[in-house]
């Protein structure tokens, strides 16, 4: 069967280059100096018996981060980024993730703790590995690259050939060709991507085989790495021989289980190899790859795509390696692994020949030009070995003064980077912050998570057989359909709350600008709020705390409100302080004082300059990707300045508070101050009652309260309801400008999955 010919004749280039990729990355938790920790796996990650993303490999210190499979390599690496950020922000503040594959600072063997798992068989398996290989070899880490061809491609290729009658037989032989050819040419990606040139002497039982100042390309892939005894050979000639020889080694006791066979390619998709005979190989796991210490997550997008294309080349090639060729590949791997990283490889001609075939394949299947160019960069590294990853790593080790020193320095930099935007998941930065926070907590606690629609903030979460849908961080099936519709309409909200006996301010509604402006005499001199009938996040709201005295200002506020809706309300302004109550179920979980957008004068700078300086705060940004919003100087802000006799060019006196907004929404530049513990419980109970009247499970209730310490009384002079909000913002509670953080996303997960708590 000539796959090249079929792909070309049937125009299958796009389908051919597609596939599904998942990555497993092992790493050691270390101290700041790069030495391995002896602490337990953090309990904050939940139970390893079910965690889909954050596991331990051999030891308690050895993290294993597992991405879900994705059709886009970019998405797989985004997940890997998110898993690293969750992990680095969760482990002890004095712990780091070591960026290299070979361990450094190994503690005495008796202090290396085998992973403490619930399943006794899993622990027993690890104890067997200790007896067979010692603990040091088990501490080696790397990247496992899981790859599946597009099932439609496999089906199309099967239908286009005549050699195989059974689809299962065809699929097995297709994946076996991929596996055998990879094992034949595995030395090539090792030459280009290896990064384990050295290790400390205590890694070896009988002394280091390395001479002083000697570096090699890959200790991990050499006979000193994570490998079986040299006489354990499993045949890849056919799926039947593979099953037969693998079962032989297990039955003879040389391997305790099939998974102890440490081939650089592992057949995947069944619990036992014999099942492949009937169900077929589903995907392959490529276990060759060292961690790239120069990348925060151990691998970069270019290399991940290169690996993808190299794997595809293995079935594109006309040849199919037999077992002798597989063994030749294993021998060459051992030779190249022990070459000097700065030296030209003994097999340069073969390497250049294969990469040239890769370039031809990329052009034939219509790959991106960038993929061709990157393959050409790899080709050039055969003539310039100093450009390879391992050679560059050796240079960096020499410059840093040692392997462990370099690893510790990089580990510390990576952790600092993970905290630069500690409130976000940088790979999913286009999603709203509340959703990112929920995703962070879901990953940390071990919920399966699927992003159904990234732009619409739609997630599917699952624990066991129980699944829930979440939109925008806290919109769930626990809310009734009607509740957000009630809260969106401020007129309906007021009527529902009034009927339920809650204090609401009086108001009039208008359907045209002319009608509203004509009513100015009714409100002249009165303190009023002008706002759209249907609004959220403070859009279109103007507040005249000192009374409205200028018809032009009144008209401008009306015009601003009508930009947001076709109906507008003018309501009495309630005297007091506005607080936001976050209610979930039967409990008020957080209370926030939102201080309207403001600046403090210094007697030197203009209002515009003071605003610019305050906007430089690292938590301020667009308000959707940052916890705080930058303060604007638009029409509403300039109206507010005019009320105070100021303009943007005014220079306020020292310590003069300048209000830029009357409404206190964080989404319009306000400051957030946690007041949960200071608020009298009677108001918290009122907020719960208001939420129930709305028919909501999650609600943001805005109350005006003159004195938060006095118990609530049944009149407007004691308290009043301004708004009830669906999908209330959570980030201002999680990351307040001042006060205690309230991690509300954990409460949302607790509501959805009480069995997880």
Curated annotation (Swiss-Prot):
Taxonomy, superkingdom: Bacteria
EC nos: 6.3.2.2, 6.3.2.3
A Pfam family of this chain: ATP-grasp_6
Keyword Ligase: yes
Keywords of this entry: ATP-binding, Glutathione biosynthesis, Ligase, Magnesium, Manganese, Metal-binding, Multifunctional enzyme, Nucleotide-binding
Binding site for ATP: 521-580
Region span, Glutamate--cysteine ligase: 1-337
Start and end residues of each ATP-grasp domain: 494-757
Pathway(s) annotated for this protein in UniProt: Sulfur metabolism; glutathione biosynthesis; glutathione from L-cysteine and L-glutamate: step 1/2; Sulfur metabolism; glutathione biosynthesis; glutathione from L-cysteine and L-glutamate: step 2/2
Binding site for Mn(2+) 2: 723, 725
Catalytic activity: L-cysteine + L-glutamate + ATP = gamma-L-glutamyl-L-cysteine + ADP + phosphate + H(+); gamma-L-glutamyl-L-cysteine + glycine + ATP = glutathione + ADP + phosphate + H(+)
PANTHER family listed in its UniProt record: GLUTAMATE--CYSTEINE LIGASE (PTHR38761:SF1)
Family that this chain belongs to: In the N-terminal section; belongs to the glutamate--cysteine ligase type 1 family. Type 2 subfamily.
Job of this protein: Synthesizes glutathione from L-glutamate and L-cysteine via gamma-L-glutamyl-L-cysteine.
Name of this protein: Glutathione biosynthesis bifunctional protein GshAB
Lineage, opening ranks: Bacteria, Pseudomonadati, Pseudomonadota, Gammaproteobacteria, Pasteurellales
């Amino acid at each position: 069967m000539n796959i090249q010919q079929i792909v070309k004749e049937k125009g299958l280039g796009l389908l051919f280059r597609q596939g599904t990729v998942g990555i497993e990355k092992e790493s050691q938790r270390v101290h700041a100096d790069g030495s391995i920790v002896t602490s337990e796996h953090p309990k904050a990650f939940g139970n390893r018996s079910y965690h889909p993303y954050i596991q331990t490999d051999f030891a308690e210190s050895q993290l294993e981060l597992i991405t879900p499979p994705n059709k886009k390599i970019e998405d797989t690496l985004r997940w890997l980024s998110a898993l690293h950020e969750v992990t680095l922000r969760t482990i002890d503040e004095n712990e780091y993730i070591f960026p290299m594959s070979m361990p450094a600072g190994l503690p005495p063997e008796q202090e290396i703790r085998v992973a403490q798992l619930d399943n006794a068989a899993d622990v027993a398996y690890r104890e067997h590995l200790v007896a067979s290989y010692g603990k040091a070899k088990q501490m080696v880490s790397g990247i496992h690259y899981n790859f599946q061809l597009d099932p439609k491609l496999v089906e199309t290729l099967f239908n286009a050939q005549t050699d195989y009658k059974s689809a299962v037989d065809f699929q097995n032989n297709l994946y076996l060709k991929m596996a055998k050819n990879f094992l034949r040419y595995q030395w090539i990606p090792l030459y280009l991507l290896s990064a384990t040139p050295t290790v400390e002497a205590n890694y070896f039982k009988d002394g280091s085989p390395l001479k002083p100042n000697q570096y090699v390309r890959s200790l991990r892939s050499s006979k000193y790495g994570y490998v079986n005894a040299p006489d354990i050979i499993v045949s890849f000639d056919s799926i039947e021989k593979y099953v037969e020889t693998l079962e032989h080694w297990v039955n003879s006791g040389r391997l305790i289980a099939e998974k102890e066979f440490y081939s650089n390619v592992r057949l995947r998709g069944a619990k036992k190899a014999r099942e492949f005979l009937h169900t077929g190989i589903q995907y392959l796991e490529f276990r060759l790859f060292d961690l790239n210490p120069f990348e925060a997550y151990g691998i970069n997008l270019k290399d991940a795509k290169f690996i993808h294309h190299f794997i595809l080349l293995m079935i594109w090639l006309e040849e199919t390696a037999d077992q002798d060729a597989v063994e030749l590949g294993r021998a060459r791997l051992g030779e190249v692994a022990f070459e000097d990283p700065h030296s030209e490889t003994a097999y340069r001609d073969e390497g250049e020949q294969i990469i040239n075939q890769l370039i031809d394949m990329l052009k034939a299947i219509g790959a991106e030009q960038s993929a061709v160019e990157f393959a050409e960069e790899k080709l050039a590294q055969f003539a310039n070995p100093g450009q390879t990853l391992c050679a560059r790593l050796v240079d960096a080790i020499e410059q840093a003064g040692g392997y462990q020193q370099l690893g510790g320095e990089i580990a510390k930099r990576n952790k600092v980077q993970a905290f630069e935007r500690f409130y976000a998941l940088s790979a999913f930065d286009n999603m709203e912050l509340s959703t990112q926070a929920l995703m962070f907590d879901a990953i940390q606690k071990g919920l399966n998570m699927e992003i159904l629609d990234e732009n619409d903030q739609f997630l599917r979460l699952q624990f066991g057989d129980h699944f829930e849908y979440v939109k925008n961080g806290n919109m769930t099936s626990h809310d009734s359909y009607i509740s957000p519709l009630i809260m969106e309409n401020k007129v309906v909200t007021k009527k529902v709350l009034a009927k339920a006996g809650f204090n609401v301010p009086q108001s009039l509604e208008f359907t045209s600008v002319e009608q509203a402006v004509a009513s100015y005499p009714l409100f002249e001199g009165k303190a009023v709020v002008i706002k759209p009938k249907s609004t959220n996040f403070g859009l279109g709201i103007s507040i005249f705390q000192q009374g409205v005295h200028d018809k032009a200002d009144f008209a401008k506020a009306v015009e601003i409100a009508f930009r947001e809706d076709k109906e507008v309300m003018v309501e009495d302004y309630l005297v007091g302080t506005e607080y936001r109550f976050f209610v979930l179920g039967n409990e008020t979980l957080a209370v926030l004082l939102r201080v309207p957008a403001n600046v403090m004068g210094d007697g030197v700078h203009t209002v515009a300059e003071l605003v610019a300086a305050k906007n430089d705060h690292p938590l301020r940004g667009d308000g959707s990707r940052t916890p705080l919003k930058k303060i604007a100087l638009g029409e509403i802000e300039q109206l507010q300045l005019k009320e105070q006799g100021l303009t943007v060019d005014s220079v306020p006196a020292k310590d003069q508070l300048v209000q830029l907004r009357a409404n206190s929404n964080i989404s319009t530049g306000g400051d957030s101050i946690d007041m949960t513990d200071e608020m009298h419980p009677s108001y918290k109970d009122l907020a719960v009652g208001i939420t129930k009247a709305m028919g909501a499970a999650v609600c943001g209730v805005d109350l005006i309260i003159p004195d938060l310490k006095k118990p609530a009384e049944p009149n407007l002079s004691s308290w009043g309801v301004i708004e009830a909000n669906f999908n209330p913002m959570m980030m201002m509670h999680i990351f307040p400008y001042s006060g205690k953080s309230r991690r509300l996303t954990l409460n949302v997960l607790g509501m959805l999955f009480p069995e997880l708590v």
